[in-house]
């Protein structure tokens, strides 16, 4: 399934349905990490952005996310949880047969005992209590009904799982696309052209154009 279709559906969930959706792949999963879907690898609410802006805030969030990965592997089912900073979220697992390849998060909701978390964050990062409280209160107060979220998010999970299966059926193409994406990222300051990339990776222009768009969801240049 085209990356662009998945991307458009996520944008629909965010803009039209008012959901804060983010994608969190495991390290060896390249469908998301090697495409424009990585743009959705972050919680977009102002409270989470505020915490990540604090000294060691981003590092702590990454560390805590590993615990979510572990919980995914232990439970092997979708669940609702509260992160260390007090943000309530739905977690939907992404599977490849018996293996878990990542998860989808629907986040950005305040919990009932917010004062405990606000105080904890203020002490943890040695920051102003009022500032933390002000940012926390920007979170959404009411969490949507799980049946509604299931109806919207489960199709996204299926799209991602099918796209992942399509990718691993052609590992050579996936590996080449991943290598090309990494090369472009490493040499972003150079005026890269289609000719240069095709020469570097010994592929035709037509193959590169079609494969790159299918893999990333956008045309090169």
Where are the language model's segments positioned?
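Basic/polar phosphate-binding segments, predominantly the helix-turn-helix DNA-binding elements
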Residues: 191, 195-221
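Recognition helices and adjacent regulatory flanks at domain boundaries
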Residues: 172, 181-185, 198-199, 207
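Short helix-capping/hinge SLiMs at alpha-helix to coil transitions
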Residues: 186-190
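Structured interaction and signal-relay segments at domain junctions
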Residues: 7-87
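N-terminal positioning helix adjacent to the helix-turn-helix/winged-helix DNA-binding module
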Residues: 172-180, 216, 220
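Juxtadomain coupling helices with adjacent low-complexity linkers
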Residues: 1-16, 20, 103-173
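Sensory/regulatory domains in signal-transduction proteins
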Residues: 69-120, 152
């Amino acid at each position: 399934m085209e990356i662009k279709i998945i991307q458009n559906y996520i944008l629909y969930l965010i803009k039209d349905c008012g959901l804060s959706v983010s994608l969190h792949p495991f390290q060896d999963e390249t469908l998301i990490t090697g495409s424009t879907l990585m743009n959705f690898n972050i919680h977009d609410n102002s409270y989470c952005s505020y915490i990540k802006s604090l000294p060691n805030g981003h590092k702590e969030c990454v560390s805590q996310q590993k615990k979510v990965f572990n919980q995914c592997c232990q439970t092997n089912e979708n669940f609702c949880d509260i992160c260390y900073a007090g943000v309530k979220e739905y977690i939907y697992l992404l599977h490849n047969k018996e293996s878990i390849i990542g998860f989808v998060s629907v986040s950005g909701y305040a919990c009932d005992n917010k004062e405990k978390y606000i105080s904890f964050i203020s002490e943890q990062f040695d920051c102003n209590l009022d500032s933390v409280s002000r940012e926390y209160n920007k979170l959404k107060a009411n969490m949507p009904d799980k049946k509604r979220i299931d109806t919207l998010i489960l199709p996204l999970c299926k799209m991602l799982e099918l796209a992942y299966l399509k990718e691993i059926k052609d590992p050579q193409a996936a590996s080449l696309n991943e290598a090309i994406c990494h090369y472009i990222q490493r040499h972003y300051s150079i005026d890269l052209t289609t000719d240069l990339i095709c020469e570097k990776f010994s592929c035709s222009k037509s193959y590169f154009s079609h494969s790159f768009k299918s893999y990333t969801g956008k045309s090169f240049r």
